[in-house]
Amino acid sequence: AVDDMIEQLLPLLDDGDILIDGGNSHFPDTIRRTAYVESKGKLYIGTGVSGGEEGALKGPSMMPGGSPAAWESVKPIFQAICAKVEDGSPCCDWVGENGAGHFVKMVHNGIEYGDMQLICEAYQLMRDLLGMNDDEMHEVFAAWNKTELDSYLIEITRDILAYKDTDGQPIVEKILDTAGQKGTCLLYTSDAAD
């Protein structure tokens, strides 16, 4: 789909124009696309974008890579729309040429998947080995969220453990015990093995 879109856009672009891919492209594809688009006289930026729903509202974290000549043009735009840390610094900077932006995003996703697995295992141990109920586990995750473990994933786990359905029962007990994936974790583990 990305390659088809590039083919549709190239005839509409002038030399030196910048094409930006903000999807979860696999970094080898971004390397290939950068070379191809540059061979046509245009510039290509492959940008990892992170932040989900909150990022859409408050600004995402952005990880641009690709054609170095494009960075100075997109930098003020990207750094204006991205999330900011407490001191106002932008959550966006140039990460490197070719597929570097999508590579960093892939590693970011891999770390996030690892964190989610650790949370699942902690939950299972507390529930099945220690016999803790949802309220007790909520308290543990709330305490963890006040330490160096503070994170969005710990926060939402804490919150879901406290949430009750309309009948007063914990909603977590009604959630189907399955998980899906979009394939990005498979790419991460495959590239890590290589």
PLM features: residue spans?
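Short acidic alpha-helix initiation/capping motifs at coil-to-helix transition points
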Residues: 114-117, 180-187
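Conserved small/polar residues in nucleotide/adenosyl-binding loops
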Residues: 188-193
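Conserved short loop/turn motifs at secondary-structure junctions
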Residues: 143, 175-179
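Class I S-adenosylmethionine-dependent transferase superfamily signal
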Residues: 9
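Rossmann-fold dinucleotide-binding core
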Residues: 2-6, 20, 26-138, 146-173
